[in-house]
Amino acid sequence: MAPNIRKSHPLLKMVNNSLIDLPAPSNISAWWNFGSLLAVCLMTQILTGLLLATHYTADTSLAFSSVAYTCRNVQYGWLIRNLHANGASFFFICIFLHIGRGLYYGSYLYKETWNTGVILLLTLMATAFVGYVLPWGQMSFWGATVITNLFSAIPYIGQTLVEWAWGGFSVDNPTLTRFFALHFLLPFVIAGITIIHLTFLHESGSNNPLGISSNSDKIPFHPYYSFKDILGLALMFIPFLTLALFSPNLLGDPENFTPANPLVTPPHIKPEWYFLFAYAIVRSIPNKLGGVLALAASVLILLLIPFLHKSKQRTMTFRPFSQALFWVLVANLLILTWIGSQPVEHPFIIIGQMASLSYFSIVLIVFPTIGTLENKMLNY
């Protein structure tokens, strides 16, 4: 019998082992769809971004006009721009759900996969941040100024670091140029780290909702999960296209319709919705350095999660107390997101401080305690 090229060709063999003949657990639910959705989001963002970059000018006097020109005069430029801007939102929705799945089902116990995932999240956040500055609207400019200025709180080297990042004494032309270079580069870095992420995942194989070994019952990825992923993709693209075509500016800031002006500060400086939870945590601490440390901790805390797992069971499927706590954490993050969008005044200040405190308390103290308690209740 002639050898199957899919299994013998050096390149196709790799694709085959990753996407076609990959042995997958037979019982993974729709929560396992988000990995492939993230891959599609990345490809969509790279494609639309590349098309936008061909019409964009990274210069403070031309950036705003070049984006407006793209939307008005380039064939389907408005569509490409709307897909790119809202694609970022869907990218973050998918990554948050993907992380939530990992937390709920104990996927973080695959430490290498989890750690590369956290690095991917940080890189994605950096990419989205520098990208938000490029249209050079009011919120772009002031967002860049406020967030980069936080680094000046780092003792001894802070101010030097910020001026080095800006390329001057304020956010100006050199800043915009380097942010464009970074925004162009980082998605390809994300693609590279994604390959590493998948390599680590395929070392162990996927986890499943029961948290037990699935070696006794595996099915090929294609056709089962390839078709399931296509269904997930269709279900994601419906709200994505609805948003991009019917209300493309819903998640944007109206301030960005005004070109950047260093002499006029917007009344409420706030980032895009997907950074609001972290922004609320920064603002809840009156000290600048404390705020920066809390900001870093709010995301880096994910790296500690494998070490805070005290339960004898991997997933939360059969742990009702941990489940309740998980949803309290989700509600807490939604409250933080809401607080981040509100002005710094009573009662939002105290609500933000309580939500920030409970966020760290739940993850660092309550989760391990509940896990230990459940072990005792089940006589483990």
Swiss-Prot record:
It is found in: Mitochondrion inner membrane. The chain crosses the membrane at residues 34-54, 78-99, 114-134, 179-199, 227-247, 289-309, 321-341, 348-368. It is a multi-pass membrane protein. Its cofactor is heme b. InterPro entries: Cyt_b/b6_C, Cyt_b/b6_C_sf, Cyt_b/b6_N, Cytb/b6-like_sf, Cytochrome_b, Cytochrome_b_C_euk/bac, Cytochrome_b_N_euk/bac, Di-haem_cyt_TM. Heme b b562 binds at residues 84, 183. The cytochrome bc1 complex contains 11 subunits: 3 respiratory subunits (MT-CYB, CYC1 and UQCRFS1), 2 core proteins (UQCRC1 and UQCRC2) and 6 low-molecular weight proteins (UQCRH/QCR6, UQCRB/QCR7, UQCRQ/QCR8, UQCR10/QCR9, UQCR11/QCR10 and a cleavage product of UQCRFS1). This cytochrome bc1 complex then forms a dimer. PANTHER family: CYTOCHROME B (PTHR19271:SF16). This is Cytochrome b. The gene is MT-CYB.
